[in-house]
Swiss-Prot record:
Positions annotated with a glycan in the UniProt record: N36, N127, N264, N272, N325, N368
UniProt name for this protein: Relaxin receptor 1
Organism: Mus musculus
Gene3D superfamilies: Low-density Lipoprotein Receptor, Rhodopsin 7-helix transmembrane proteins, Ribonuclease Inhibitor
Membrane-traversing stretches: 410-430, 444-464, 487-507, 528-548, 578-598, 630-650, 652-672
Keyword presence, Cell membrane: yes
Length: 758
């Protein structure tokens, strides 16, 4: 009997310590507990939409409900619902306000005259408590228009055409608690217009044309809690105590105006203010003492303004602040100790801000911070003690991996291997094709070298993705600022530009020899070598120039994890944006147009010149072959560059482009030419096919030599002319001497000569 209480006490004590140990789990910096489990998960696995804990603890409490804006939004939604016609649908009570105008509804002491085509305030019984006059044609509020409605508690005048409000329009409304004047045309409110509204708690005047206000505008509003002046035309706030006659004001909303600055006297009397919303204005100056007297402020929203400099002590008196939003401002620098006084801060929004001096010290004093929002997910590594950090990805990379998509992680190796192997194979095999046109072969080898660099670039990106696998957020920012990333980005641009210029050079060389066969514009060795060297020099200058002037180009190649500057707008440098446009919409677009025009002209020239000297049937067959080859050359160029041209045009037009596009372009679109050029310019040509046929025939000959020793050896010529179709050439053109100078051949052999440069 005595052992029962003893074991009961042991059970209770054990339970207590078990729960305590589970709830007080100590996790290393950057990790957080899984609820009441002893397991810890890193920051990147919390609030990512996946149940990594197994009990969904890592996905609990991920919503940012700091401040009381969410609760007020719900209340706001309820008010609109209550003020609408739906609130009068279930008429269970009789009307107690006497006769009402046509098209109006009545229930108890509530009157709904929404969309009743009214042009003036209706006259009903004085005991009405709620009057909704929304979406009518009321233009003015005359003196004493509501004087007899002493019991009126809620007045809704939204979506009328009110442009004039008499100073005594609201006289006598001593019981009014909520007044809605939104979506009208009010330009000015005279001082004392709200003088009798001593019980008013909510005043909503959003979406009007108010251009100025003064403290006297709100005289008499001793009970006002909420003041909303969103989307008006205010350009400045009075340099006087705005809350002088609103001592109980808690919520003040100036969103969507044109306010340029905040001075130190404006909020001096707003001692009870808990929420201040100043987003989407044109604020470019903040007085250091602008918020000194807002010691009860819980939420401050300064987002989407034009603030460039934050005074060092601007937030020092906001001891109670739990939510701060300074996102989407062109802030040049954030001081390391900028947030030191905000110990109670729970939510911090820094979206759209490039923080060049970011470091962990900046956020370490924010011990209660649970939500933080950055421009780049790479910044999350500098706030490891914050459970919810957004964004989780930039579309290219994620908190875990340099390449966010498994498809990209696989195909970066596949495309890299195809590009490198194809071009190296051509470089090695090209000397064995004994073509008389060595200058053309030299250009093709140079093209393969440039294309091979693209494969090297993709290989390195894949290697670093493998190196950072599972913990990329720890290395993201250092990686994008590293020499490796800068060099790889330069290598990609070098490959791209040299390849484009070489393709243009090869195309123009063909064009001149086909369209102008009797001109003295034949390619010479010295000229060809000079052009090739010049192209590579231009490529090096274009690719490495951004590394030589960091002030002008900023972090040109370090705007994303793949180090490719497709969206140069992210650098924040006008010079970088112009440079990127010159490359992609200047050099590359002009080159693409030249290639398309040249191949079209060549095909037309061959068609016009050959029809009179060859049989029609053979000519049609030959032109089909030429058309197919020209089509694939132009098609691959278009497939590679048209998407990039479109993206650059859209970015110039400030169209929002998903960040994930960059990685798909870099892995699947940009290398198209690099991967297919070896096939188009070498592997599908007649000389290469003949060489392979010869090697295969010789191999079979060696296999059968023991059985057929007396058989005459097959001895095909080693002089291969790069052309198509070979069998259609006359015997005279099969002699090596006939090809010593392709530009001197007759007009009849133009199509064959064209093939000799393929």
């Amino acid at each position: 009997m005595t052992s029962g209480p003893f074991f009961f006490c042991i059970f209770i004590i054990g339970k207590y310590f078990t729960l305590g140990s589970a709830q007080d789990v100590s996790c290393p910096l950057g990790s957080f507990p899984c609820g009441n489990m002893s397991r810890c998960l890193p920051q990147l696995l919390h609030c990512n939409g996946v149940d990594d804990c197994g009990n969904r603890a890592d996905e609990d409490h991920c919503g940012d409900n700091n401040g009381w804006s969410l609760q007020l939004d719900k209340y706001f939604a309820n008010y609109y619902k209550l003020a609408s016609t739906n609130s009068f649908e279930a008429e269970t009570s009789e009307c107690l306000v006497g006769s009402v105008p046509m098209h109006c509804l009545c229930r108890d002491l509530e009157l709904d005259c929404d969309e009743a085509n009214l042009r003036a305030v209706p006259s009903v019984s004085s005991n009405v408590t709620v009057m909704s006059l929304q979406r009518n044609f009321i233009r003015t509020l005359p003196p004493n228009g509501f004087r007899k409605y002493h019991e009126l508690q809620k007045l809704c005048l939204q979506n009328n055409r009110i442009h004039s409000v008499s100073v005594s329009a609201f006289r006598g409304l001593r019981s009014l608690t909520k007044l809605y004047l939104s979506h009208n045309r009010i330009t000015f409110l005279k001082p004392g217009v709200f003088e009798d509204l001593h019980r008013l708690e909510w005043l909503i005047i959003e979406d009007n044309h108010l251009s100025r206000i003064s403290p006297l505008t709100f005289y008499g509003l001793n009970s006002l809690i909420l003041l909303v002046l969103m989307n008006n035309a205010l350009t400045r706030l009075p340099d006087k105590p705005l809350c002088q006659h609103m001592p109980r004001l808690h919520w003040l909303d100036f969103e969507g105006n044109r306010i340029h600055n905040l001075r130190n006297l404006t909020f001096i009397s707003c001692n009870n203010l808990t929420v201040l919303v100043m987003r989407k204005n044109k604020i470019n100056y903040l007085n250091e003492h602008a918020f000194t007297h807002l010691q009860k402020l819980d939420e401050l929203d300064l987002g989407s303004n034009k603030i460039e400099n934050l005074p060092p002590n601007i937030f020092k008196d906001l001891k109670e602040l739990s939510q701060l939003n300074i996102s989407y401002n062109p802030i040049q620098k954030i001081e390391v100790n900028q947030f030191d006084c905000l110990a109670k801060l729970k939510s911090l929004s820094l979206e759209g801000i490039e923080i060049s001096n970011i470091q962990q010290r900046m956020f370490r004093p924010l011990i209660n911070l649970s939500h933080i929002y950055f421009k780049k997910f790479q910044y999350c590594g500098y706030a490891p003690h914050v459970r919810s950090c957004k964004p989780n990805t930039d579309g290219i990379s994620s908190l875990e991996n340099l390449l966010a998509s498994i498809i990209q992680r696989v195909f970066v190796w596949v495309v890299s291997a195809i590009t490198c192997f194809g071009n190296i194979f051509v470089i090695c095999m090209r000397p064995y094709i004994r073509s008389e046109n060595k200058l053309h072969a030299m250009s093709i080898i140079s093209l393969c070298c440039a294309d091979c660099l693209m494969g090297v670039y993709l290989f390195v990106i894949g290697a670093f993705d493998l190196k950072f696998r599972g913990e990329y957020n720890k290395h993201a920012q250092p990686w994008m600022e590293s020499v490796h990333c800068q060099f790889m980005g330069s290598l990609a641009i070098l490959s791209t530009e040299v390849s484009v210029l070489l393709l243009t050079f090869l195309t123009l060389e063909k064009y001149i020899c086909i369209v102008y066969p009797f001109r003295c514009l034949r390619p010479r060795k010295c000229r060809t070598i000079t052009v090739l060297i010049f192209i590579w020099i231009i490529g090096f200058i274009v690719a490495f120039a951004p590394l030589g002037n960091k002030e002008f180009f900023k972090n040109y190649y370090g705007t994303n994890g793949v180090c490719f500057p497709l969206h140069s707008e992210d650098t924040g440098s006008t010079g970088a944006q112009i440079y990127s446009v010159v490359i992609f919409l200047g050099i590359n677009l002009v080159a693409f147009i030249i290639i398309v025009f040249s191949y079209g002209s060549m095909f037309y020239s061959v068609h016009q010149s050959s029809v009179t000297v060859t049989e029609i049937q053979k000519q049609v067959k030959k032109e089909v072959v030429l058309a197919k080859r020209f089509f694939f050359i132009v098609f691959t160029d278009a497939l590679c560059w048209i998407p990039i041209f479109i993206l650059k045009f859209l970015s110039l037009l400030q169209v929002e482009i998903p960040d994930s596009i960059t990685s798909w372009v870099v892995i699947f679109i940009l290398p198209i030419n690099s991967a297919l050029n070896p096939i188009i310019y070498t592997l599908t040509t007649r000389p290469f096919k003949e060489m392979i046929h010869q090697l295969w025939h010789n191999y079979r000959q060696r296999r059968s030599v023991d059985r057929k020793e007396t058989q005459k050896a097959y001895a095909p010529s080693f002089i291969w002319v790069e052309m198509w179709p070979l069998q259609e050439m006359s015997s005279g053109f099969m002699k090596p001497g006939a090809f010593t100078d392709p530009c001197d051949l007759s007009l009849v052999s133009q199509s064959s000569r064209l093939n000799s440069y393929s």
